[in-house]
Amino acid sequence: LSKDLAKFDRIGAATLEQAGLVTKLGLALLFLLVVWVGVTIVSAGGEQRTIVIIAGIIGGYMALNIGANDVANNVGAAVGSRALTMVGALVIASIFEAAGAIVAGGDVVGTISKGIIAPEDFPNSDMFIWCMLSALLAAALWVNIATMMNAPVSTTHAIVGGVIGAGIAAVGFSGINWPKMGMIAASWVISPLMGGVIAAIFLAFIKANIIYRDDKIAGAKRWVPILVALMAGVFSAYLVMKGLKRVWTPGGWTITAIGVAIFAATYFVVNPLIRRQANGMENRNKSVRTLFTIPLICSAALLSFAHGSNDVANAVGPLAAIV
């Protein structure tokens, strides 16, 4: 009897797993259907309408794959530490990803759409359009395959490689903006190195001033509000410098003053919250981890904004070039 019950349990688990897969596939197809309807409504008539609709659907497919693969980079730490539930993390990611793309994504869209290959280097516009379509589809397929293999890959590498490959096939090596490509490739090396160095510095600082202190709670009370305020101040300076440049171009001192003001305001808001949360806590690392809930949530939100301002262009850039 126990063997039969175990078989039924396995059958039930397999059924639930298949139902989950079908639900996910249905939601993905529904999203692409909504994209198709939306692009059909807003696109103008004429010979290029069909191409625009196809490009919109492929762009939606690419966006799905970016969400499936890259969003984990933004919220994984917050979910893994249980600072956020999966639903809460996805809500935060969706809001801040969209905000980042809208507010600060214009420059990266421009680089993908016309910074690597330029329309004027092609014999006609149709060849440029098909080149971008090919790059977008190739990148989307590769990221989809990598996601199915549970491999975290760079969607930026995928789309840049797709654009270069399609450009070389269409007009040869001379059609590629190699100086720009050199800058992009350099960023691929510099970014992980800088990220690792900065992370190591922060970890060493936290260990020295909080984790390895005799009074861990006192250290957390002092430094956690400062770390949260530092994130807010730096982000505000970035937002003013990058996101508002179309309507306002402030000087360096103005940007610095705004960052310092936001730092101070955030500190005076967060400091009493952390101190109130720390009251009565035991002097253990487990208690310290609880006090890092707010920084983890803030970092997930800000990282999602940064990701939206950069990687969403991987789907929007080729589409903008076509439209």
Residue ranges and their predicted role:
Residues 1-323:
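Alpha-helical transmembrane segments and immediately membrane-proximal extracytoplasmic
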